[in-house]
Design a protein with these regions (language model features):
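N-terminal pre-domain/capping segments
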Residues: 2-129, 223, 282-296
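Active-site acidic/histidine proton-transfer and metal-coordination neighborhood
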Residues: 10-12, 16, 22, 105-198
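A cross-domain feature marking catalytic cores of carbohydrate-active enzymes
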Residues: 35-39, 65-67, 96-101, 133-135, ...
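Acidic-and-aromatic substrate-binding clefts and catalytic sites of carbohydrate-active enzymes
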Residues: 40-46, 66-79, 102-113, 138-147, ...
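Alpha-helical scaffolding within the catalytic cores
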Residues: 47-50, 77-83, 114-119, 182-186, ...
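Acidic/histidine-rich catalytic cores of soluble enzymes
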Residues: 62-63, 160-247, 259
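H/E-rich (His + Asp/Glu) clusters that bind or coordinate divalent metals
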Residues: 246-268
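Structured C-terminal subdomain patch of bacterial secreted/periplasmic proteins
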Residues: 266-273, 281-283
Length: 296
């Protein structure tokens, strides 16, 4: 082989390698596969380390926590630093957490911020990016209740933002009911500071409420729906079910993640397991990887 032929072949191989590499990168998932740990709360209570190991084998990489004990300063029986070390050793991460902020609506600012400080410190120790307001208690499902809520969300959001973290509100079905001619979530979108208060869309509750489609909801606050909860709805009872076993066709309803502003998503199933919570987590991620992941 003469030198010119060698150079041409080497150039061709290099070009093919570059194209192949670019193709591989374009097919590489942008987001880690996340799970809201409430889905496997029974297993986490019994043996959190073994549970995390099993979830990793299934393919889960990132988690959203729940149930931080502010009095004992513990996640699943571990201090934030201990839990972070466990995650690091397993090659896993957390990016968000649901905290008991919904019980603080009528606390004084001092007590509210004291509680919030504990959540912030724990979240920072884990290396999280988001603190999430999980739900609005039933007694506040009214126009006056949402007026108080947006005030509290702004207060909490401003403080959390100053800490270097982000704050988000998680929707339920009642957030799509009308309160003085507007949906509850519309009041939140319009009356909270978008720099302080982001949004976590729970697609199950959007579809169950049946008041607005996910893509139209995202259009109400483009770029602000930073977190997603992905789960399915039983075709008959409308209860939770494993992904792929229910009525939600994500190929038709899933919004554009770029328009949403998506940063993290989490699979979730709050109950109604076909066998048990870990089996359901496996069924859901298997279906997700086959049918939904490519849409995100």
């Amino acid at each position: 082989m003469n030198r010119l032929t060698f150079i041409k072949k080497a150039s061709l191989i290099s070009t093919i390698s570059l194209i192949s590499g670019a193709h591989s990168l374009s097919n590489f998932p942008k987001y880690k596969i996340g799970l809201q740990l409430f889905s496997v709360r029974d297993a986490m209570e019994k043996d959190p380390i073994s549970t995390l190991k099993s979830l990793k084998k299934m393919g889960y990489q990132d988690f959203e926590t729940y149930g931080y004990d502010t009095k004992r300063k513990k996640y699943y029986g571990f201090s934030p630093i201990e839990f972070k070390t466990i995650l690091n050793d397993l090659g896993l991460t957390t990016s968000s957490g649901h905290y008991g902020l919904n019980g603080l609506m009528e606390l004084s600012d001092y007590k509210l911020f004291k509680y919030l400080d504990s959540c912030i410190n724990a979240s920072l120790a884990l290396g999280d990016k988001y603190i999430v307001y999980p739900m609005l208690n039933k007694k506040y499902h009214s126009y006056d209740g949402y007026k108080l809520l947006v005030k509290k969300l702004n207060q909490m959001g401003e403080k959390i933002k100053k800490s270097g973290l982000n704050f988000a509100y998680h929707n339920f079905g009642y957030d799509f009911n009308l309160y003085d001619r507007k949906m509850g979530l519309e009041w939140i979108i319009e009356e909270t500071n978008p720099d302080w208060v982001k949004l976590q869309v729970d697609f199950y509750w959007v579809m169950r409420a049946n008041k607005i489609m996910p893509k139209d909801l995202i259009d109400l606050a483009q770029g602000r729906f930073k977190l997603w909860h992905i789960k399915d709805m039983d075709k008959i009872t409308k209860d939770y079910t494993e992904l792929g076993y229910g009525s939600i066709d994500y190929s038709k309803v899933l919004p554009n993640p770029n328009i949403s502003g998506l940063e993290y998503y989490y699979l979730e199933q709050g109950g109604n397991y076909k066998i048990d919570s870990m089996d359901s987590a496996k069924k859901s991620i298997d279906f997700f990887k086959k049918k939904i992941q490519k849409l995100i």
